[in-house]
Design a protein with these regions (language model features):
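Gly-rich Lys/Arg/Thr-decorated short loops/hinges at beta-loop-alpha junctions or inter-strand turns
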Residues: 2-15, 81-82, 186-198, 247-248, ...
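Short internal beta-strands
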Residues: 67-74, 134-137, 303-309
Length: 417
């Protein structure tokens, strides 16, 4: 049989053309607010990283020029150096006390590339009640989605910050410096709380101590890249490891994907063959993609798997302890592998350490080995991650340690996982 062939019609396709330049009237309002603010804060997120390294440099120039404090979400770590004097540390559910308190009490919040997610805001009706809020984001759907803002600026972070800086300089680089000095004095009082302090042990390795030693022994490496899995170890890594540049911290934030870190570290190592690439992991997350050790061995990738092994699903166990009356379910394992033997079976190097006195030597052995390493660090099984904003509570109500947890979480918060 024969017939006429009729080709498919060309389907119409939509195009995404993001707006790069921000509205000049809104930028003017932001500059005016910067000039007048008495208690400002820069609240930064992953959008700064995504905008490119130029955005981070412009941000640093703006922070230095204004002397405003700066905090960051989990995904924005590295956009401003952790060694910088204006750095307050990460904010949010497991963020630092001084960062969360400054966010709550500020009179000007400048959101740059963050999304006001629930781990940052706490209870929305109590979120930073007295502040004027500006929000710079390339995605218009993120503006006013969760928190109403007073100064919305849609555009690419680098383009907008460049315009903000140029306008602020042209107007005389003014700030309310006397008021900002008082603001820094208040922040100093919050810093004196020392919210990351913990009770160390000479018998068992505390996970915080393990990461402090890892930081001390690796922070001089400019080519250090850190990946993580998801859980308590991820939060401790964000608290105790410092990042000086963007794109040196790879983690699964909003999605919270257990199993992400190991394949991510392989990708980073392939992209940077000579770099030091460390995946900070929990044993449960790491086992979700353990088969990738075969990839690391096959391609001779010197990735370091730094497992904080508490034999628990630590974050799940912590929530069950604090929110659900210690009714534990499916948050531990009695059938974990011997990770040293597992590494050997793959043809990698395995190291196990359980004594705090041996930790530094074990870390140095891991760092000096030119090949993939599975580092099994046996840590305190029931250590909780603090500070912590309880679910259903405002972001200025934080648990700072075990002594603050009793009756801290109501029944309404217990359902907000």
């Amino acid at each position: 049989a024969s017939g006429d062939y009729i080709s498919n019609k060309k389907a119409p396709t939509s195009q995404y053309r993001p707006k790069l330049k921000g509205d000049i009237e809104q930028i003017t309002k932001l500059v005016e607010a910067i000039e007048q603010s008495e208690k400002p804060i820069f609240y930064t997120g992953g959008g700064v990283i995504n905008s490119g390294t130029g955005a981070s440099q412009l941000l640093r120039e703006l922070v230095k020029g204004t002397n405003f404090p700066i905090t960051s979400t989990l995904m924005g770590l590295g956009c401003y150096p952790a060694s910088g004097s204006n750095w307050l540390g990460m904010l949010g559910m497991h963020g630092l006390y001084e960062a969360n308190m400054a966010m709550h009490d500020c009179d000007l919040m400048i959101n740059i590339g963050a999304r006001f997610d629930d781990r940052i805001t706490g209870r929305i009706d109590a979120f930073s009640p007295s502040s004027k809020k500006a929000h710079i984001d390339i995605d218009p759907s993120s503006i006013n989605k969760v928190i109403h803002v007073d100064i919305p600026i849609i555009g690419d972070i680098a383009h907008v910050l460049d315009d903000v800086l140029n306008m602020w300089k042209a107007r005389g680089r003014k700030t309310n410096s006397a008021a900002i000095d008082k603001w820094w004095s208040q922040i100093g009082e919050w810093r004196s709380v020392k919210c990351l302090d913990y009770k160390n042990s000479k018998k068992t390795i505390k996970p915080q101590f393990a990461l402090e030693r890892l930081e001390e022994l690796t922070r001089s490496r400019p080519d250090r890249f850190i990946c993580t899995e998801v859980g308590q170890h991820q939060m401790w890594a964000a608290q105790f490891l410092g990042f000086e540049e963007p794109n040196q911290w790879m983690t699964s934030g909003g999605l919270g994907t257990m199993g992400y870190g190991f394949p991510a570290s392989i990708g980073v190592q392939i992209a940077h063959p000579k770099a030091l690439v460390i995946n900070v992991a929990g044993e449960a997350s790491w086992l979700m993609n353990m088969q990738e050790m075969g990839t690391a061995v096959q391609y001779k990738l010197p990735v370091k798997q730094f497992i904080l092994n508490n034999e628990r699903l630590g974050m799940v166990r912590q929530w069950q302890e604090l929110l659900h009356g210690e009714r534990y379910s499916h948050s531990w394992s009695d059938a974990l592998p011997d990770f040293v033997k597992l590494a050997d079976a793959f043809g990698a190097k395995g190291i196990m350490v359980s004594d705090p006195a041996d930790l530094d030597d074990a870390i140095m052995e891991m760092l000096s080995y030119d090949g993939p390493v599975l580092f099994d660090c046996l840590v305190e099984k029931h250590e909780n991650c603090f500070p912590m904003i309880p679910s259903g509570e405002p972001h200025n109500k934080m648990l700072l340690g075990e002594a603050t947890t009793e009756d801290a979480i109501g029944s309404s918060g217990a359902v907000l996982v």
